[in-house]
């Protein structure tokens, strides 16, 4: 593959660098992200996914009808174990 040839991967990972000129105007320059920028992007996306999971979990939690103390305790323990397990594997 030629050095300058764009693949779907490189096209999809292009990002915009915004550089300020001396007079305050902004210019946009397309470029390929470095590893740090890709990691930042990945972490932002994963944060959004985690927030969505937490919201869905709370909605499910709030939808329970007349939960007993024991059933709540069981659910909390299961969720806690699951989140800890996922935290270590990610």
From Swiss-Prot:
> Which residue positions hold the site described Low pathogenicity?
66
- Record bears the keyword Membrane: yes
Recite the UniProt keywords alphabetically. Apoptosis, Host cytoplasm, Host membrane, Host mitochondrion, Host mitochondrion inner membrane, Host nucleus, Host-virus interaction, Inhibition of host innate immune response by virus, Inhibition of host MAVS by virus, Inhibition of host RLR pathway by virus, Membrane, Modulation of host cell apoptosis by virus, Viral immunoevasion
* One of the GO biological process terms: symbiont-mediated suppression of host cytoplasmic pattern recognition receptor signaling pathway via inhibition of MAVS activity
Q: Tell me the Pfam families matching this sequence.
A: PB1-F2
User: Which GO terms of the cellular component aspect does the record hold?
Assistant: host cell cytosol; host cell mitochondrial inner membrane; host cell nucleus; membrane
The listed locations are: Host mitochondrion inner membrane; Host nucleus; Host cytoplasm, Host cytosol
Major localization class? host cell
Alphabetized InterPro entries for the sequence: Flu_proapoptotic_PB1-F2 (IPR021045)
Give positions of region: Disordered. 1-31
Cite the residue spans of the region called Mitochondrial targeting sequence: 65-87
Does the record's keyword annotation contain Membrane? yes
Role description: Plays an important role in promoting lung pathology in both primary viral infection and secondary bacterial infection. Promotes alteration of mitochondrial morphology, dissipation of mitochondrial membrane potential, and cell death. Alternatively, inhibits the production of interferon in the infected cell at the level of host mitochondrial antiviral signaling MAVS. Its level of expression differs greatly depending on which cell type is infected, in a manner that is independent of the levels of expression of other viral proteins. Monocytic cells are more affected than epithelial cells.
Similarity field: Belongs to the influenza viruses PB1-F2 family.
| Further details from the record | Is not encoded in all strains, and seems to be dispensable for replication.
Please describe the quaternary structure of this protein: Oligomer. Interacts with human SLC25A6/ANT3 and VDAC1. Interacts with host MAVS.
The name under which this protein is listed is: Protein PB1-F2
Source organism per UniProt: Influenza A virus (strain A/Turkey/Wisconsin/1/1966 H9N2)
Starting at the broadest rank, the lineage of the source organism is:
Viruses, Riboviria, Orthornavirae, Negarnaviricota, Polyploviricotina
């Amino acid at each position: 593959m030629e050095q300058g040839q764009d693949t779907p991967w490189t096209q999809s990972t292009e990002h915009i660098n915004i550089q300020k000129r001396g007079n305050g105007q902004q210019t946009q320059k397309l470029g390929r992200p470095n590893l740090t920028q890709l990691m930042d992007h990945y972490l932002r996306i994963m944060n959004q996914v985690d927030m969505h999971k937490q919201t869905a979990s709370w909605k499910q939690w709030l939808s329970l009808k007349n939960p007993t103390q024991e059933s709540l305790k069981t659910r909390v323990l299961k969720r806690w174990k699951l989140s800890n397990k996922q935290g270590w594997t990610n």
